[in-house]
Structure formats: structure tokens, C-alpha cells
A protein has these predicted regions:
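Bacterial N-terminal signal peptides
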Residues: 2-15
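N-terminal intrinsically disordered, low-complexity segments enriched in P/E/S/T
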Residues: 19-136
Length: 136
């Protein structure tokens, strides 16, 4: 069974896909579905660590209620990820491993440079440390 960390579905109907993305080789960490044009699995776009890193990572330091002091997060900008899959929706529905779900307007993800973090302070995030992916 694959590890699905996040399910980003768009509050719109699914359209026919326009492009085939490369299939991941490693363990799947992220599954995107909904109103996306580019997929690599039936109606979905799935990613492992390597395929996420190929999109280009950014880092920034911030404080948060989840970590002590200033923390460096490194990950893929959600804006870039949404462009890569050809997302056409306006809302991201994000579901974590523990079934916690939240909704983020896509415009907020773009306006505030939200990232999908893979690393915290230079280390890959583990499940027990809020990983393996974390929306920041």
C-alpha cells in the first residue's frame, strides 16, 4: 500500500488530462487529484521525493507554533506544483495521513508563497515529526 500524505482535490469536476507526467520510482508520498490536466496514474498525479525535488526546492526561515525558535523549511512551492499538474481549480482540499483535512484557497497558496516542505532544518521530515510532507 502506498503512503498517501496529501490529497489535493479541486472543487470542480475532473477534466480529461492533457499530459502524461513521469511515473515515480520510489515510495509515493503525494497524490494529487481533481481538476488537473497532467497525470501519471489514472486521473491522478503521484510523486515520490525525487520527483518533487526535480520541480525545484526553495527554503525559508520562520517561526511557528509547531517548532521551537526559527526553523528552516525546504520544499516545493505549491504554485509551481499546481502549474506542473495543470491545476484548474480554485480550492485545495488537503488531507493528511491522520485524516486531518483543511481547505486552502489556491489564491492564498500563490499570494503567500506556500510551500510543501520535505525538509526541516536540512533533514527530511519523518512521519513522527509532522512529515513526510508539511504545508508551510
Amino acid at each position: 500500500m502506498r503512503l498517501i500524505v496529501l490529497l489535493l482535490s479541486f472543487v470542480v469536476t475532473i477534466q480529461a488530462w492533457a499530459g502524461e507526467l513521469p511515473k515515480p520510482v520510489g515510495k509515493v508520498l503525494l497524490t494529487l487529484s481533481g481538476n488537473i490536466e497532467n497525470t501519471n496514474e489514472e486521473g491522478k498525479a503521484v510523486f515520490d521525493i525525487a520527483s518533487l525535488e526535480k520541480l525545484g526546492l526553495v527554503s525559508f526561515k520562520t517561526t511557528s507554533p509547531w517548532y521551537d525558535g526559527r526553523t528552516t523549511f525546504t520544499g516545493v512551492p505549491l504554485k509551481k506544483l499546481m502549474e506542473y499538474v495543470g491545476a484548474k481549480g480554485s480550492v485545495l482540499k488537503i488531507t493528511a495521513l491522520n485524516d486531518y483535512t483543511t481547505v486552502i484557497p489556491l489564491s492564498d497558496a500563490q499570494k503567500y508563497n506556500v510551500i510543501l516542505a520535505l525538509k526541516v532544518n536540512g533533514e527530511y521530515m519523518r512521519i513522527r515529526d509532522k512529515g513526510p510532507l508539511f504545508v508551510v
